[in-house]
């Protein structure tokens, strides 16, 4: 056992929660990605703090893996620690119309549990295949709703192990972004202020959202969700389609014929294929319409096309 593996085992007693050289394509919705040096399932804040301390001592990069649904990982993979939040980070506690939820909880699971209790405000999240923490950091949204509308407070753990409670103003919500993006902040818990609502109406609204998703998105192929953010006053998908790029292909990566702001994996696509195609789409749209699209997907590892 390597010295690093031994140190990880001193923190994570269950060896089944530590995987070495784990291919990340197994953990991303687009089914692309090279190996992580270590993929570690973290069950509580104590483990997380100790892992962050270890990473700081060893100068290791740290990545937080949610559902892997809006993520492209380089073919070379990533160095350091990839952490998946489980255990206490997936819990949901309801007190009246206030919900406390861990950053590792699934957004669709949370939306459905809220509706079953007659709590509204999260219907938009039923079709967003991500976690609460990732959704907060990018201010995920759909169907006219977003995280900014429901978040009352967030507890984050910084890369140096400090814990801090943040109000919405400190989080800095904006369209598909917050001030937490690009920082070391890890979302441990979120407090949400929901509203009492009719359960049948909530479930009906969510059925509509899910049916619309099935009708408009290429769910039959692995994909990473919306590739580009919508520019002000327009839609990325419309611009890409008007540029004649539906069906455009690099290797096994293809601009979806169903929704132009999705890139699908036809079978053996690589991260290089996807990022080369994204760059081609961005360049073509900018040349045709004078609009420079901004990536919505997160990109880990080697990435000369879309630098942070």
Curated annotation (Swiss-Prot):
Q: Which domain of life is it from?
A: Bacteria
Q: Tell me the cofactors it needs.
A: FAD
The entry assigns this protein to a family as follows: Belongs to the MurB family.
Its pathway? Cell wall biogenesis; peptidoglycan biosynthesis
> What biological function has been recorded for the protein in this entry?
Cell wall formation.
Q: What is the designated name of this protein?
A: UDP-N-acetylenolpyruvoylglucosamine reductase 2
Q: Name one GO biological process term.
A: cell wall organization
- Top EC class of this enzyme: oxidoreductase
Q: Which reaction does it catalyse?
A: UDP-N-acetyl-alpha-D-muramate + NADP(+) = UDP-N-acetyl-3-O-(1-carboxyvinyl)-alpha-D-glucosamine + NADPH + H(+)
